[in-house]
């Protein structure tokens, strides 16, 4: 049966929907209508395709990581090089698409949330390109962790608002951005950075990010004589790079799909972001999805060395894939991710983002159980420039025995 999700009400099975206050429903309905129209408009897609090619630098290579493959000694590993996009990650695919959509809707201002800063940088970049006012909401903890990206956003003309509520991380930035959207609904478009939030956001983000999987599928077919890979893999926080990789393969039942979530200091601690391992369904940021919550239903703090993965929920479509068994989600600790970070740097000369390092770490485990005539495509969602100082300080502290 051909996969067709979401349904007319924005649900993926029981997950998703539009759990927003009445004050936001108008904006959500307006966005849904505008998106349906844009999808049917060939000139909209043509403008986006032109930007992706000539501004972002797509298509990104599908690179055969031979040294990594030899080191692990299992499946042939291919890297989908989203780190080579303009701004250094997959986030630009969605940011450009949504700014084009905002322009089409006649909006003058752009707001967005960011964790690691990559979505903030991508949104600020797209807003600069289209001469739009831009405010980025970022948790105070992430502002400290990602000072370089904060400066980048400001350099691009965006205002960065440091959020001091709650645990001062990504979920708090989303709350602040949603509040700002309610206040400026007439002239403002909110660019959700991950496959989260009320419908139609998860679908919009999925569709704009699906360029990752579409390209990878075609590129692999070209080098393999028309075959499909045996598996595809990506790291997962909210889940946008993963859904972009997975969605074009969802009807290809022979292709296994793996997501690497962050288990931080370990599943036996409270310092993790492993929603599938430890969460249960609840409503967060306008959608029903698996979330990390305590016995009283209060949303818990997520933790990861990677600022882009410490979100206490996972997008509704991933929740549906998990429930029906279409994708497998495993958790990777900070230590394992750091090993992946070092390994790819040493073996392939590619410094990955800490987010992507979780996928590299899971690839080691999965590829080792596969045979050399099988293949695994890993989404290398971003480059590690933003994380080098943090990793340097971590390694120095460990060397001093702190």
From Swiss-Prot:
Reactions listed under catalytic activity: (1S,2R)-1-C-(indol-3-yl)glycerol 3-phosphate + L-serine = D-glyceraldehyde 3-phosphate + L-tryptophan + H2O
GO annotation, cellular component aspect: cytoplasm
Q: Which PROSITE patterns would you find in this protein's record?
A: TRP_SYNTHASE_BETA (PS00168)
Which GO MF terms are attached to this record? tryptophan synthase activity
Q: What keywords are annotated for this sequence in UniProt?
A: Amino-acid biosynthesis, Aromatic amino acid biosynthesis, Lyase, Pyridoxal phosphate, Tryptophan biosynthesis
Q: Pathway of this protein? A: Amino-acid biosynthesis; L-tryptophan biosynthesis; L-tryptophan from chorismate: step 5/5
- Write down the required cofactor(s): pyridoxal 5'-phosphate
Sequence positions bearing N6-(pyridoxal phosphate)lysine? 91
Q: What is its EC number?
A: 4.2.1.20
Q: How does it assemble?
A: Tetramer of two alpha and two beta chains.
What the entry lists under NCBIfam families is as follows: trpB
Q: Fetch the PANTHER family from UniProt.
A: TRYPTOPHAN SYNTHASE (PTHR48077:SF3), TRYPTOPHAN SYNTHASE-RELATED (PTHR48077)
Q: Write out the function statement from the record.
A: The beta subunit is responsible for the synthesis of L-tryptophan from indole and L-serine.
The entry assigns this protein to a family as follows:
Belongs to the TrpB family.
Write down what this protein is called. Answer: Tryptophan synthase beta chain
Task: List the taxonomic lineage.
Answer: Bacteria, Bacillati, Bacillota, Bacilli, Lactobacillales
């Amino acid at each position: 049966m051909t996969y067709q999700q979401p349904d007319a009400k924005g649900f993926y099975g029981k997950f998703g929907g539009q759990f927003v206050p009445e004050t936001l429903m108008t904006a959500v309905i307006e966005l849904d209508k505008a998106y349906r129209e844009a999808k049917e408009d060939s000139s909209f897609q043509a403008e986006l395709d032109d930007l992706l090619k000539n501004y972002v630098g797509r298509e990104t290579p599908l690179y055969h990581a031979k040294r990594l493959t030899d080191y692990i000694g299992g499946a042939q590993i291919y890297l989908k090089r989203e780190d080579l996009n303009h701004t250094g990650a997959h986030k630009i695919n969605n940011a450009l698409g949504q700014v084009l959509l905002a322009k089409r809707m006649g909006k003058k201002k752009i707001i967005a949330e960011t964790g690691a800063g990559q979505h903030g940088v991508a949104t600020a970049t797209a807003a600069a390109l289209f001469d739009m006012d831009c405010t980025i909401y970022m948790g105070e903890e992430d502002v400290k962790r990602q000072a370089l990206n904060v400066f980048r956003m400001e350099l691009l003309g965006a205002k960065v608002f440091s959020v001091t509520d709650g645990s001062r991380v990504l979920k708090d930035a989303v709350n602040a951005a949603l509040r700002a959207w309610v206040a400026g609904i007439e002239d403002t478009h909110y660019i959700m950075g991950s496959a989260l939030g009320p419908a139609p956001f998860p679908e919009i983000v999925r569709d704009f990010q699906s360029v990752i999987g579409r390209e990878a599928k075609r590129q692999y077919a070209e080098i393999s004589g028309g075959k499909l890979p045996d598996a595809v893999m990506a790291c997962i926080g909210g889940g946008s790079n993963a859904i972009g990789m997975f969605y074009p393969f969802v009807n290809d039942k022979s292709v296994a799909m793996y997501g690497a979530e962050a288990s931080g200091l370990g599943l036996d601690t409270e310092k993790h972001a492993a929603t599938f391992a430890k969460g249960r369904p609840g409503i967060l940021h306008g959608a029903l999805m698996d979330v990390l919550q305590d016995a009283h239903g209060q949303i818990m703090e997520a933790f990861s060395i990677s600022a882009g993965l410490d979100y206490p929920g996972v997008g509704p479509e991933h929740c549906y894939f998990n429930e029906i068994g279409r994708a497998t989600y495993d958790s990777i600790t900070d230590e394992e991710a750091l090993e992946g970070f070092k390994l790819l740097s040493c073996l392939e000369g590619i410094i990955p983002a800490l987010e992507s390092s979780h996928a590299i770490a899971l690839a080691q485990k999965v590829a080792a159980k596969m045979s050399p005539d099988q293949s695994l495509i890993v989404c290398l969602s971003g480059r590690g420039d933003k994380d080098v100082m943090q990793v340097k300080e971590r390694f120095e502290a460990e060397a001093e025995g702190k």
